[in-house]
Amino acid sequence: MSALNSLPLPVVRLLAFFHEELSERRPGRVPQTMQLWVGCLLVILISMTFEIPFVALSLAVLFYGIQSNAFYTKFVAILFVVATVLEIASLFLIYKWSYGEPLIRLIIAGPILMSCMFLMRTHRLGLVFFAVAIVAIYGQTFPAMLDYPEAVVRLTLWCIVVGLYPTLLMTLIGVLWFPSRAITQMHQALNDRLDDAISHLTDSLAPLPETRIEREALALQKLNVFCLADDANWRTQSAWWQSCVATVTYIYSTLNRYDPTSFADSQAIIEFRQKLASEINKLQHSITEGQCWQSDWRISESEAMTARECNLENICQTLLQLGQMDPNTPPTPAAKPPSMVADAFTNPDYMRYAVKTLLACLICYTFYSGVDWEGIHTCMLTCVIVANPNVGSSYQKMVLRFGGAFCGAILALLFTLLVMPWLDNIVELLFVLAPIFLLGAWIATSSERSSYIGTQMVVTFALATLENVFGPVYDLVEIRDRALGIIIGTVVSAVIYTFVWPESEARTLPQKLAGALGMLSKVMRIPRQQEVTALRTYLHIRIGLHAAFNACEEMCQRVVLERQLDSEERALLIERSQTVIRQGRDILHAWDATWNSAQALDNALQPDRAGQFADALEKYAAGVATALSHSPQITLEETSASQAILPTLLKQEQHVCQLFARLPDWTAPALTPATEQAQGATQ
């Protein structure tokens, strides 16, 4: 700890980031890492034995292809086969009409690249077109490196083998031999979330970061999609299992902030918590067995009062409704998403994005051809790889690519100088490469925030030490050229994406926040009664809120990187946005607490009370996008009926009023603390 205290704050944050990424717990990560690791070693063995070129490309196919579960791996493998056919066909089309004419070759390749980049952003199968764009650009380097058309055709045909045999390999490893099923990962993930919930129910623990809670909720939703596609039993009882996922997400996120020491430590409360934990354990056992949980648990009037006293009644009701739900309830028909985005042909940003990518590639091609430096052709690949929809995400990808390339180049340099002279056979080579590939595979299976570092590190290492050589290599020039090519491509892309039609999310962020707050207002309009339809609707909208707040948080992180914006305006926007996100999360949890008390109120009173909050929040959200929102002020009517029934509800709603008052004033020139207390709120 003392050593960390002496380091600069940015370094400490970077180390904390990598510690979080490398230690991430995710069902299926270990099997995916092992599949990727074994696949890399087999690719090296096969390529070296049969002298198959482009080892780095084969490794890239593995890193992009092996996914977290067997169904997803099979789906990506099919896409890769289709992409290989399309990309080789496009290359032969280009070579046939323009092999000896670089200008004509670029004129033909340009529209192909633009079409692929356009479809990558607008089509559901964007990954296919991304692969075609990569090969279309990479193939332009073949005629420049070789003077014989026959050799170029032979290399292009080798690309079919290079793309398809790793695809076959990952299908055998990840789908047939050692499959990691989505249903197994879902059972493990649900039980892990319930374990965390029980820990917070029984012990006083520090709450986990809200971003982690939201990512876990999104991960469960993604697994649910794979389970629906891959498991027949899950599809048959999908309505119950989707309710189970929503219930577990609600219990996990609610108990994350639960502190048992905040309530009276009476014997009745202790026994009730133990009983609740016992029911959660029964749910865990049913999930492990893959069975729909059915419970005959009922809450007596005294237990209901105890649950209300310790703010656990709503959790009990969600468990009760799940345990009493018919497993054969027919699911709600899901709407089929369109293959193209709605504004694909009306939004000019998509075509501008394709033009910017082509412009960056042409600049790099002109540069490395003009200086006659073929070794830096990776600059063209970099322009395609780091091309992202907006400035912030492009900068993030550039940092990841540069970081991965730097680590890969350092490893390649050390490997060439210190290890290569001592190697005599393929077995020794595989033993030395094993820890490098294992490290790259573990990083590549982390979250999207850092996974590309592992992929780029292994690919750069292979480009410098294993590419097109089938024996010991001591050429340090390859390491230098590959790293410089990536740096040049990164610099060119940064300039193009910053100054040519920059797509800033600074205008989109307030709209995103307004959408999240609008969803929160919908939650407040749901009747706060323990009725099946209302409670299920509440749980599903609540999951949508997790996704909305997480998307806003990620967008804030990208806007921070948009250096083309005025620094003061950017800082003010980020500060206000983060305040809205933080207060929105607090308001959601505070509103949860009112459910434990509001159900005892008369139904005629409740909608009017909840409507005050929803109206105020909707009015505030409508002005966020136009920077015309003031902090909401709410006046609560303290009727004698409400005071007589449940005085604690007034305190809970007053707390919500206080959180409303802390929402930032978007009309002020700078953020200032709220000086006026919200009406109806107490200190």
From Swiss-Prot:
GO CC, alphabetical: plasma membrane
Domain of life according to the entry: Bacteria
Protein's cellular compartments: Cell inner membrane
Keywords (A to Z) from UniProt: Antibiotic resistance, Cell inner membrane, Cell membrane, Membrane, Transmembrane, Transmembrane helix, Transport
UniProt-recorded Gene Ontology molecular function terms: transmembrane transporter activity
TM ranges: 43-63, 75-95, 100-120, 125-145, 158-178, 402-422, 426-446, 457-477, 483-503
InterPro entries in the record: PHBA_efflux_AaeB/fusaric-R
Pfam families: FUSC
GO annotation (BP), single: response to antibiotic
Membrane topology term: Multi-pass membrane protein
Main location: membrane
Subunit structure as annotated in this protein's UniProt entry: Could be part of a tripartite efflux system composed of MdtN, MdtO and MdtP.
Reported function: Could be involved in resistance to puromycin, acriflavine and tetraphenylarsonium chloride.
Family: Belongs to the MdtO family.
Protein name: Multidrug resistance protein MdtO
